[in-house]
């Protein structure tokens, strides 16, 4: 995702989700959308939200997990958005 696309995506989801707006205002950075445990399609190897959170915490980040949205702003119930911030 190019930087301007990422900025547009973050503006879109922040406009509709107050929790995401609050995280951005607090200096959190969007990392990725990740599958919730058990939600990855069969046969697909993908890191779950728990694996992302664990790795980021081990790297010293404060981590938050929110609802995930696609590029059109539609809720993705099988995904979670991962956010990080250095304490």
Name each model-derived stretch.
Residues 1-42:
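An N-terminal amphipathic alpha-helical segment
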Residues 7-9, 20-21, 53, 72, ...:
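Generic N-terminal initiation segments characterized by hydrophobic and/or small/turn-forming residues
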Residues 18, 47, 51, 73, ...:
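Intrinsically disordered, low-complexity regions enriched in serine, threonine, proline
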Residues 25-26, 58, 77, 81:
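Generic detector of low-complexity/intrinsically disordered segments
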Residues 32, 44, 83-85:
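Generic cytosolic/nucleocytoplasmic N-terminal low-complexity/intrinsically disordered segments
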Residues 35-71:
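Short, hydrophobic/π-rich interface segment
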Residues 64-87:
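C-terminal edge-of-domain segments
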């Amino acid at each position: 995702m190019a930087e301007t696309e990422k900025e547009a995506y973050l503006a879109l989801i922040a406009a509709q989700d107050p929790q995401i707006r609050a995280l951005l205002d607090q200096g959190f950075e969007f990392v990725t959308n990740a599958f919730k445990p058990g939600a990855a399609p069969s046969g697909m190897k993908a890191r779950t939200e728990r694996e992302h959170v664990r790795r980021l915490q081990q790297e010293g980040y404060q981590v938050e997990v929110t609802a995930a949205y696609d590029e059109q702003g539609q809720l993705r119930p099988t995904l979670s958005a991962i956010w990080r911030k250095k304490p």
